């Protein structure tokens, strides 16, 4: 279903970009959001620069865009309903920046979470680890590897950007995550690099909650295992510390 949605999305973007490009050639610029307001048909019909035969085919292309948009909205609604009724997706969506589309994509691509022995394994699986460039005695870190599922990676980075904007406006309720973001901001990290770093952290969080089988618990987040109550220690795997798992107590719904 995720593959079908991605195909609809590609076809919609391609059709809309083609429509926009043809209209611009005839001196009829189309701004963002015009498609949703149903003004394109009016703009094309009232234009005196475009010949009638061109108008007819532009309206056909416009109708194709609308049909693709309806299909995309329909399948997105289905995925949201599926995520709302799925236990694993519910746990994944407890992470800030992850909504139903991202959650269902991650569930489909992760498979068995036990195959990721370390947090870095799942980050590398989605291509969010930096490239290592070694020459002689020097070793440098480059951009991310961009391996794995491209759609899931782009959704995670998009979600990370939303979380960063919420944190900048003071709307993010997670104190541990706010502290982490503030620490990275003090390093004057570029926006794109910060989004990738936060997306990687979100993946580590997803791995932790799926292995433990629980959602976030803000009360015990950021605390060493030895200092937890005895009834809470069983939720921690081995000798790992929950300090590796920031524990937001809210979720942000985005695609």
Region spans (language model):
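Residue-level detector of well-ordered alpha-helical segments, enriched
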Residues: 11-18, 102, 118, 152, ...
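Phosphate-backbone recognition surface of nucleic-acid-processing proteins
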Residues: 91-94, 100, 106-187, 191
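Low-complexity, acidic/Ser/Thr- and charged residue-rich accessory regions of DNA metabolism proteins
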Residues: 137, 141, 177-255
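Short helix-capping/linker segments at secondary-structure and domain boundaries
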Residues: 15-16, 73-76, 112-115, 162-171, ...
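Conserved phosphate/pyrophosphate-binding and hydrolysis machinery centered on Walker-type P-loop NTPases
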Residues: 58-62, 82-85, 96, 142-146, ...
């Amino acid at each position: 279903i995720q593959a079908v949605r991605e195909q609809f999305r590609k076809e919609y973007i391609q059709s809309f970009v083609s429509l926009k490009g043809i209209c611009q050639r005839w001196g009829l610029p189309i701004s963002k959001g015009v498609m949703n307001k149903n003004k394109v048909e009016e703009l094309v019909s009232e234009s005196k620069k475009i010949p009638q035969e061109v108008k007819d085919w532009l309206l056909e292309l416009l109708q194709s865009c609308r049909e693709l948009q309806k299909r995309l909205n329909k399948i997105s609604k289905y995925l949201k309903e599926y995520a709302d009724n799925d236990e694993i997706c519910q746990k994944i969506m407890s992470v800030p920046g992850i909504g139903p589309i991202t959650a269902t994509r991650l569930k489909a691509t992760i498979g068995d979470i036990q195959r990721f022995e370390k947090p870095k394994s799942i980050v590398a699986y989605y291509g969010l680890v930096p490239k290592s460039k070694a020459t002689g005695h020097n070793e440098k870190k480059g951009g991310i590897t961009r391996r794995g599922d491209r759609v899931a990676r782009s959704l995670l980075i998009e979600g990370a950007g939303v979380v960063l904007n919420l944190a900048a406006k003071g709307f993010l309720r997670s104190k541990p995550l706010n502290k982490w973001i503030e620490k990275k901001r003090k390093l004057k990290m570029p926006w794109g690099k910060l989004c990738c770093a936060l997306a990687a952290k979100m993946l580590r969080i997803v791995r932790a909650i799926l292995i433990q089988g629980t959602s976030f618990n803000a009360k015990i987040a950021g605390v060493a295992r030895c200092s937890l109550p005895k009834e809470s220690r069983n939720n921690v795997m081995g000798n790992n510390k929950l300090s590796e798992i920031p524990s937001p107590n809210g979720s942000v719904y985005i695609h």
